[in-house]
């Protein structure tokens, strides 16, 4: 099973490479263009385990400082797993959450949801567009073919977003299956691995774009190397008013 899981990761990443590069480049271009202003940021939002995607890009060694992670306590697993599942299906919670953050017209938000079907992530895309933001969705497009939306509009996340990146993950997330007698067990999810790969590809392309435009990418250094503290403090000072969770 160890080998099978690794093989599935390789296979899915190869599919991302062969089918999603243009979408990732489009998203990177859109985000780069939104970062022209001195204190512009882009935002990342996800519910449940997908919130780890926001954490992956936020305050990260080797990552951009201009990333605002939207991490509301209502949707965090460590604040109550059952509560987070309840609110993930609740579209009304989104306006209350987004009102806590400074989301400027013309900025970009990445919304991460493996299924793309629940009320909160779909409403997040709708609300963000209402506020004038550009929406990039990171989701598995397989779900729309196999199930229904839980949002009152009947829409999936991919129906609302400006750019849709398919993480090429499976329906149900779990990728390995064992059948024994009358029992069928599916296990070993992929979405966190695939989302992390895609988001770091996206960020690498954003940084490349910034360099090509003679912009200075505000990249954090690892706090465990010499000289990093002074460098990072300058970036923190620059963006601290925009990043709620610093």
From Swiss-Prot:
Organism the protein comes from: Caldanaerobacter subterraneus subsp. tengcongensis (strain DSM 15242 / JCM 11007 / NBRC 100824 / MB4)
Family membership: Belongs to the UPF0309 family.
NCBIfam families: PRK02947.1 (NF002805)
PANTHER family: PHOSPHOHEPTOSE ISOMERASE (PTHR30390:SF7), SEDOHEPTULOSE 7-PHOSPHATE ISOMERASE / DNAA INITIATOR-ASSOCIATING FACTOR FOR REPLICATION INITIATION (PTHR30390)
GO MF annotation terms: carbohydrate derivative binding
Pfam families the record matches: SIS_2
Protein name in the entry: UPF0309 protein TTE0306
Transmembrane residue ranges: none
BP term (GO), one: carbohydrate derivative metabolic process
SIS domain boundaries: 31-212
Xref: HAMAP family: UPF0309
Cross-referenced InterPro entries: RpiR-like_SIS, SIS_dom, SIS_dom_sf, SIS_GmhA/DiaA_subfam, UPF0309
């Amino acid at each position: 099973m160890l080998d099978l899981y690794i093989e599935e990761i390789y296979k899915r990443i190869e599919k991302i490479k062969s089918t999603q590069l243009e979408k990732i480049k489009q998203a990177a271009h859109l985000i780069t263009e939104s970062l022209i202003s001195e204190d512009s940021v882009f935002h990342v939002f996800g519910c449940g385990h997908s919130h780890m995607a926001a954490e992956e890009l936020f305050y990260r060694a080797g990552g951009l400082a201009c990333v605002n992670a939207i991490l509301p306590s209502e949707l965090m697993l460590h604040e109550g797993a059952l509560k987070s599942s309840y609110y993930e299906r609740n579209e009304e919670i989104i306006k209350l959450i987004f009102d806590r953050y400074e989301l400027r017209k013309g900025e970009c938000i990445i919304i991460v949801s493996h299924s793309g079907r629940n009320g909160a992530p779909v409403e997040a895309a709708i609300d963000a567009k209402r506020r004038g933001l550009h929406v990039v969705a990171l989701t598995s497009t397989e779900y729309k073919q196999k199930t229904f939306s839980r949002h009152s509009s009947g829409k999936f996340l991919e129906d609302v977003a400006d750019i849709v990146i398919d993480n090429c993950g499976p329906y149900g997330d779990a990728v390995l299956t064992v059948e024994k007698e009358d029992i069928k067990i599916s296990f070993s999810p992929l979405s966190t691995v695939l989302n992390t790969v895609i988001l770091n590809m996206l960020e690498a392309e954003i940084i490349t774009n910034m360099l090509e435009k003679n912009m200075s990418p505000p990249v954090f250094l690892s706090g465990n190397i010499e000289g990093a503290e002074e460098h990072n403090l300058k970036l923190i000072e620059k963006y601290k008013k925009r990043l709620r969770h610093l």
